[in-house]
Regions:
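A Rossmann-like FAD-binding core segment of flavoenzymes
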Residues: 3-24, 30-32, 37-38, 101-190, ...
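FAD-binding core/adjacent interface of flavoenzyme oxidoreductases
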Residues: 13-81, 161, 192-197
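Short, well-ordered coil/turn residues at beta-beta hairpins
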Residues: 40, 46-48, 53-55, 86, ...
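FAD-site-proximal beta/loop scaffold in flavoenzymes
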Residues: 61-77, 168-216, 235
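Cofactor-binding loop segments of dinucleotide-utilizing enzymes, especially the Rossmann-like FAD-
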Residues: 72, 88, 111-113, 210
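Rossmann-like NAD(P)H-binding beta-loop-alpha module
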Residues: 81-102
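A conserved FAD-binding loop/helix module that cradles the flavin
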Residues: 93-95, 208-253
Length: 253
């Protein structure tokens, strides 16, 4: 559908994976996996992020089904059910507050020695959030459904959903290779530093979607960021062309 909608416009489509990109005079040059090189004046990266999941056996098989990372995406389907959550110690109160919008049956898993502060522990206990310490040995599932979480010491927790806030890493190193900086701390750690319009520290290079600092990780946000980045990249080209002397050469590539 997207290709068909682009047909009336002056757009070139190239099939293939980008294996390299470099800054050249006047823009960028991109190399595809088939060896083809494509030059452009502005470049928008929409390469996304990759989830770095805990190594607990059985978790990966249930990922995106009953092991989830976004309560806004899956919360309604699991409302009122038995939830467990595995998050960094400094975010337990924030996470429990968020998840309580969908259920009051909450269990915090520490997956090892607890690093939860005494203050946060008291807050959780005051709201009937169970805290289970110990390493997760495996997840037991039936098809797409989580049935139980097995914790060291032989303890079995019957739960319906596990919320995991794992780490993210760039799905591609193109941004770093082109000279971009990544956010190094906080909830946005690992994303490319960019302004609200997707512009990075590298002149002419934009980023959109989950890989960018400018939005939130969702399909709707990624689409919106792509539209904004494209508009501002286009505006930058028009601005450059308008500054050229009358009759001077104008690059259209």
């Amino acid at each position: 559908i997207g290709r068909e909608q682009l047909r009336p416009y002056d757009v070139q489509l190239h099939d293939g994976a980008v294996v390299d990109a470099r800054k050249i005079e006047g823009g960028f040059e991109v190399t595809l996996d088939g060896g083809q090189e494509v030059a452009c004046r502005k470049l928008i990266l929409a390469t996304g992020m990759t989830d770095v999941l805990p190594e607990s056996p059985g978790l990966r098989e249930l990922w995106g089904k009953s092991v989830i990372h976004c309560p806004y995406c899956h919360g309604w389907e699991f409302r009122g059910r038995r939830w467990a959550f595995l998050v960094p110690a400094d975010t337990v109160v924030e996470t429990a507050t968020l998840l309580s919008g969908w259920t009051t049956k909450l269990t915090l898993l520490t997956n090892g020695p607890s690093e939860v502060s005494a203050e946060h522990r008291a807050w959780l206990e005051g709201r009937a959030v169970e805290i289970v310490e110990g390493r997760i040995e495996r997840l037991e599932g039936d098809g797409d459904e989580l049935k139980a979480i097995h914790v060291e010491g032989g303890r079995r927790l019957d739960r319906d959903v596990l919320f995991v806030h794992g780490r993210l890493r760039q799905a591609s190193d193109l941004a770093v290779r082109l000279g971009c900086s990544l956010v190094d701390t906080g909830p946005k750690a690992g994303v490319v530093k960019a302004d609200p319009f997707g512009a990075t520290e590298v002149e002419g290079l934009y980023v959109a979607g989950d890989a960018s600092e400018s939005g939130v990780p969702s399909v709707a946000s990624a689409v919106a960021e792509g539209a904004v980045a494209a508009a501002f990249a286009c505006r930058a080209i028009f601005t450059e062309d308008a500054r050229r002397p009358p009759g001077g050469p104008v690059r259209r590539g």
